[in-house]
Amino acid sequence: MKKLISPNQIGFMKHMGTQDHVFLLQTIVEKVVKKNKKKLYVVFIDFKKAYDTVNRNRLFDKLRKLGINGTYMKNIEAMYKRTEYCIKLKAVHTPPVLSNLGLKQGCPLSHMLFNLYIDDIKDIFDDRCEPITVQNTKISHFLYADDLVILSKSKEGLQRCLDKTHFYSKINLLTISVKKSKSMIFNSSGKFIRNITFHIGDEKIEPVQEFCYLGIDFKCSGTVKHGANVLNDKGNKALRPLMNVIARFKIPPKTAIKLFHTYISPIITYNTENLSKFSDNEIKKFKDDGIFEATAKSKIDTTHRKLLKFIMGVSRSCPNLAISGDTGEIPLSLKSYRLTLNFWHRVTNMDNDTLVKKALLENISLRTNWIITIEKLINTLNIADKIDDPSKFRHATQESLERKWKTWWRQALDNPELSRLTFYREIKNEYGYEEYLNLTNFHQRKLVSKLRCSDHALEIEKGRHKPANVRKRKEERFCIYCDKNAVEDEKHFLYDCTLYDELRKQYHIWRDETYALFLKDNLSETKDFIFKAFSLREENVPSALSG
């Protein structure tokens, strides 16, 4: 298959994906626009119902010219000898209609046949089209199935390409949707150049300032439109109905997390292989834990954390360190780094004649931020010795990312400058999913989560959010429910406050060196005590305030 099809076409090809051509386009933009400060003229072509309008006789002629004969060719012709279609209306089918055009829908062979049908488009482009050179290879176009990108160094060259493409489509009975096709002029100033236009036949192609190519929004400046933000917004939109389902059917947290990674995570991490790169400033100040500091603030994790906080029942302001620690979830931004490294490793081992491999070599010669990020990640994760073995490299990448993230998490949690999570530091020994999250009663789960993660209404936290003119220092946020003149923190609430003395007698709650394990080892008593204690606290608010 690869021998018959040009490397410019990667649609439905084994070991190839949309990220390959996104990477190729980004590389060309990086070289022409950002490094050489020149304009790049591009048209994104949309074929109208390309699969449905393939001329079968012309397809068979092309297959024979490619050397496909004998039994294989006879079988293909037999498949299309008599093709009938009908429409199902409820339980009734319309009379069958014969069809002499198009490829069969749902047939696994159709993708390959279409690739072979359109592959000879490569022969129409020549040097007068003024192609872009990447690693000594001239590129005037590339395809992902029927998504065609045509590009040139000049407006004259691009128009010449379009004239040839228009003629090609006529001969091959393909229809170009001019309304859906768009032109863009990439330039270093980022200006929307609308006075230079292109046409297909007599129809003008609409110039645009940005275009969504294979799911990624490119701007005429050459940048990707808020890459991580856009993907996160798409994920957030898909999360809302999932959260409704979780709440309606009371889906357990573990199952909810699995659903998130099945349906939402792929949306957020789509094509992040090309987005995972540090800025110039980040690279300059990069240090060993730099990727983890960036991860803690990454916007790509916003939707993920939103789901975790939702199933835990905590507020948006609940510390992310506690959310990660109690769910045991690894941030999606780290997954994007893993995907980036795996993508780089896959392309590194490709044949040199593939366009994406040439794009990688171009990145290396240009010393782009993307390549520098790859180098930084490999050095930080200490996985350079695993590069020669694909399976070991993938495993080592994931293992090292998770291990170093957990180490960074513990160090961040133990930071003495972190005023919040004092109680959490004492009760949380290891990074991982906590059993209390399996509580089926959401209100009980919520109360335990809030107490553990410093997201409660005790004075130690409540006082933090008061206006500056009445806010008290941490050591002055006293409990108003007893006369011990003590700070109302988690330990005081659990063990010391006299308001709950009678309640404690109903449970095996005591203070000794093992108290930090209480919330974990005595879960059945913990949830009941916390629930009743907070209820008692609410009942006594008026009298406490008056006293």
Residue locations for each model-derived region?
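Family-specific functional microsites
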Residues: D414-E417, L421-G547
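Short, conserved micro-motifs composed of acidic
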Residues: A91, T175-Q209
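Mobile genetic element proteins and their domesticated derivatives, centered on retroelements
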Residues: M1, L25, D46, L63, ...
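Catalytic palm subdomain of template-directed nucleic-acid polymerases
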Residues: K49-L66, H141-K170, N187-S189, C220-V224
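Conserved, non-catalytic sequence blocks in retroelement Pol enzymes and Pol-derived host proteins
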Residues: I10-D20, V32-K37, F47-T53, K65-I68, ...
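Extended C-terminal regions of large enzymes
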Residues: H261, K287-D288, A296-H304, S315-K462
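Conserved pre-catalytic core of RNA-dependent polymerases
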Residues: M1-L116, D120
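Non-catalytic, peripheral interaction segments enriched in hydrophobic/basic residues
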Residues: S6, M13, A145-D146, S177-K182, ...
